């Protein structure tokens, strides 16, 4: 089972309920700005195209998107951000990656270290856990939305690597270069994904029990609440019952 996709689904639902629109917009604007540094034409820049699509899905105003692109290309003055990935461990030896976009490295290092230390985790050295993850496209679909055989044929024909049974959902995994094609095929088939993103997918998982589950959730939420944090990935394997209890 892929606990990371269950956590992503729970986060998506909790985010919608909590209506943390300002936080979501801040993260999306940073992603658009960084992506636009590689070129302001979304047709020629897959990362920018994906970032703009994510912003539109959250109903971000077009003017906000335009200004974020212009800051990235240097057309208008903006904050000088850098992207950093921190590595660390949670309870039970769970591996964690934290991707940040920051204008103050020292401040962010201190905040991330504090979040780890206060919530049952610890920072690791560069390279300590990154090798446990691979960059993949992940598209999560409710089982009620599609039959396995039909979905399998659809996604494999459009470049996906695998279709996994993930409890109440199907999870499609693909190479980042195939992500847009697979996602477009899914949408054209009339299927709306629960979650769709390119991220760091763990190659192996660690199962937690008892109090470790609550500690791990608290740590993940503390890291994700960081002002500079864009994404948090881990190789914890939550089961559905554990997450439903946490989401309560």
UniProtKB/Swiss-Prot annotation:
One of its GO terms (cellular component) is cytosol. It comes from the Bacteria. SUPFAM superfamilies: YebC-like. Keywords: Cytoplasm, DNA-binding, Transcription, Transcription regulation. It is found in: Cytoplasm. GO terms for molecular function: DNA binding. InterPro entries: Integrase-like_N, TACO1_YebC-like_2nd/3rd_dom, TACO1_YebC_N, Transcrip_reg_TACO1-like, Transcrip_reg_TACO1-like_dom3, YebC-like. It holds the Pfam family Transcrip_reg. One of its GO terms (biological process) is regulation of DNA-templated transcription. The keyword DNA-binding applies. Belongs to the TACO1 family. PANTHER family: TRANSCRIPTIONAL REGULATORY PROTEIN YEBC-RELATED, TRANSLATIONAL ACTIVATOR OF CYTOCHROME C OXIDASE 1. HAMAP family: Transcrip_reg_TACO1. This is Probable transcriptional regulatory protein Acid345_2125.
């Amino acid at each position: 089972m892929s606990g990371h996709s269950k956590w992503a689904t729970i986060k998506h639902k909790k985010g919608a309920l909590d209506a943390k629109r300002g936080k979501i917009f801040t993260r999306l604007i940073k992603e658009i700005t960084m992506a636009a540094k590689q070129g302001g034409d979304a047709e020629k820049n897959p990362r920018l195209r994906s970032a703009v699509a994510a912003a539109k899905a959250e109903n971000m105003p077009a003017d906000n998107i335009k200004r974020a692109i212009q800051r990235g290309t240097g057309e208008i003055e903006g904050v000088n951000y850098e992207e950093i990935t921190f590595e660390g461990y949670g309870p039970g030896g769970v591996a964690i990656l934290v991707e940040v976009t920051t204008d103050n490295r020292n401040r962010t290092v201190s905040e991330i270290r504090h979040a780890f230390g206060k919530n049952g985790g610890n920072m690791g050295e560069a390279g300590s856990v990154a090798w446990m993850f691979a960059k993949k496209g992940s598209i999560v679909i409710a089982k009620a939305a599609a039959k396995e055989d039909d979905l399998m044929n659809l996604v494999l024909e459009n470049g996906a690597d695998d279709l996994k049974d993930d409890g109440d959902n199907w999870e499609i995994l693909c190479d980042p270069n195939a992500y847009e094609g697979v996602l477009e095929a899914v949408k054209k088939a009339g299927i709306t994904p629960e979650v769709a993103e390119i991220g760091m997918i763990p190659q192996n998982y660690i199962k937690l029990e008892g109090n470790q589950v609550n500690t791990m959730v608290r740590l993940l939420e503390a890291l994700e609440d960081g002002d500079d944090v864009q994404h948090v990935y881990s190789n914890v394997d939550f089961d559905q019952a554990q997450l439903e209890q946490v989401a309560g």
